[in-house]
């Protein structure tokens, strides 16, 4: 092996690995992202879109278009993202009414991130009967932990746990299968 090859070899390997990763991502995007991680990414994008809707009210179609054009959206289940945004945006007031009954803090005084996470979690608890409540709760808490205030995830957990107890009494408290 020539002496100069030892210096070029790591660069060549790194470039080849990056090309392989990019090709796999492109193939997954072309096939349509599905699975648990794709749904989590769709929830994350929905959270960001709901936050943006609170901070900078714009037409829903423009916000959806912006997030679908984002390179990170290749890893997300875009159908689920669109479904979440299309369902949550028009019923924000109804979700706020339910939130007012579940927590002591008025919805208008909630932190915007926790507010959006609670909308997302409440929607999944009320409208996604095929989704176990533990999954909806865990995903919402994870988003609050990742994007929210220091102890915001504890508040989100308490509110959504109370909501799950009321909305899904048959499923709540059952042992894991």
Where are these regions (language model features)?
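N-terminal interaction/assembly modules
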Residues: 2-146, 150-177
């Amino acid at each position: 092996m020539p002496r100069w090859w030892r210096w070029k070899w790591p660069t060549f390997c790194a470039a080849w690995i990056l090309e392989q990763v990019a090709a796999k991502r492109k193939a997954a995007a072309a096939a349509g992202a599905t699975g648990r991680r794709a749904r989590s990414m769709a929830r994350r994008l929905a959270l960001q879109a709901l936050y943006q809707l609170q901070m900078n009210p714009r037409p829903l179609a423009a916000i959806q278009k912006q997030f679908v054009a984002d390179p990170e959206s290749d890893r997300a289940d875009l159908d689920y993202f669109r479904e979440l945004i299309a369902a949550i945006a028009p019923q924000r007031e109804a979700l706020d009414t339910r939130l007012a009954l579940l927590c002591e803090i008025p919805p208008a005084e909630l932190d915007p991130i926790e507010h959006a996470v609670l909308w997302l979690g409440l929607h999944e608890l009320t409208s996604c009967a095929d989704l176990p409540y533990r999954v909806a709760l865990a995903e919402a808490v994870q988003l609050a932990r990742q994007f929210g205030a220091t102890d915001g995830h504890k508040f989100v957990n308490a509110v959504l746990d109370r909501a799950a107890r009321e909305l899904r009494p048959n499923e709540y408290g059952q042992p894991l299968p």
